[in-house]
């Protein structure tokens, strides 16, 4: 007869990191980010801006097909946008919204406030430059002409919808957005394989896109792209398209950026 008390039960090892280990890993990542040379951080940030722009392009190309219902279109479009964060996470680029989690390292006093703010500024600017570069490439490649130029109208429509909302609403949508982004990064950090990381981030990112929340780096692509298309004569009948100018872009990005930052602080 087997003595149950003496038997050894072996439990499978968890296939992801525990929350405490995720926090520790996030702190280490924050220290690494804070100590990156400016040139390297800027280059990695440009890559991240470009990657998010690729996700934004995929999203607007998909939205140009109106055969799906509104809800299905938003959900599938959100999954298309996931391309951007998957590339950022797997390739190791520097994304401003994800870097809001550097406050974990600040909280544990492993970096200073000046280091964190400096890293944020460098990455924010780098993200913007990378996104603008993709705007240029998309324009020169004539991608907007696809689907009988419906893609161009989709670009204007998406952008116009972001500059016709009041500042406070954009700010709170930015907070909601980065709740999901921080959760996606947190889940991605927990994963031990590339598949774990990719699968883990899909739903949080698809959810924030489907809900229409405001991601400042995504808007660094959406807004200039929409403005360029409107200047080329597309989307003339889209409500609010006339606000697609430098002032409108600055208005949106200021609110979205501050909202995205706030949730990183609150997360800790």
For each feature predicted by the language model, list its residue ranges:
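Alpha-helical transmembrane segments and their helix-helix packing motifs
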Residues: 2-267
